[in-house]
Amino acid sequence: MHITCEGKAYELFEGATPQNLWNMVSGGRDPETAVLADCEGDIIDFQTPFTGDTDVKWIPLGSPLAHRAYQRSLIMLLAIAAKEVYGGKIEVAVKHALGKALYCEFSDGHVPLQKELDVLCYKMEEIVKEGRDITQLTVGISKAEAFLRLKGRKADADLVTQMPVKEISVSQCGTFIDYFFGPMLPDMSFLKIFHLSSYAPGFLLHVPDPCLLYTSPSPRDRTRYRM
């Protein structure tokens, strides 16, 4: 494949990803300067293979596009932490946005106290420090639909069946697999800023402003989010 990036041309193997290209061109730059790839208007994550010849522009962590990937990856982080804390017996459901936060509930309906949320938050921090990779798997639409219906996500399952494709990419981190409707960050190490707070009957997952993702947070911001 013929790939151009930052005014230079590269010949990459079939199946190459933006991560492969970034490894070639980064030159020791901060990883946060490139977390997604803009392939002539098609935004893909670092794990998704190029589909053919293209020109690549890098999207930094502080951009609005990367902020949406940050939010999706943060939801995945929360789900993984809940699976490990509760042994798979209790899942987390993201219900809707509430201001700049996401309102969530536990699958068994219990109302969490802040102390319980702090335990969940610490587990999330552990996963971030480990820097667990986020990878992509290709599955057929029928399998994706069945998976989403099994998880009780009927609206998402209906949406998947309307896609004009035969296969989609699902995200995997360790043994956890789910579909998040968009590009993800390269790995969990980028999710350094987040917070959980009680909000009966559920809780809030606080997502930071985009400007905080590419700057050093102020002391006031540090009190609002975990670092």
Residue ranges and their predicted role:
Residues K8-A16:
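Short, contiguous acidic and Ser/Thr-rich linear segments
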Residues A16-G28:
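Short amphipathic, charge-patterned alpha-helical segments
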Residues A16-P18, K57-G87:
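N-terminal catalytic cores of NTP/NDP-binding nucleotidyl/phosphoryl-transfer enzymes
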Residues A34-Q47:
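Short acidic beta-strand-loop surface patches of small beta-rich interaction domains
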Residues D53-T54:
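Loop/turn positions that initiate beta-strands
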Residues H96-C104:
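Short, conserved phosphate-binding/catalytic loop or strand-edge motifs used
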Residues Y214-D221:
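Conserved small/polar residues in nucleotide/adenosyl-binding loops
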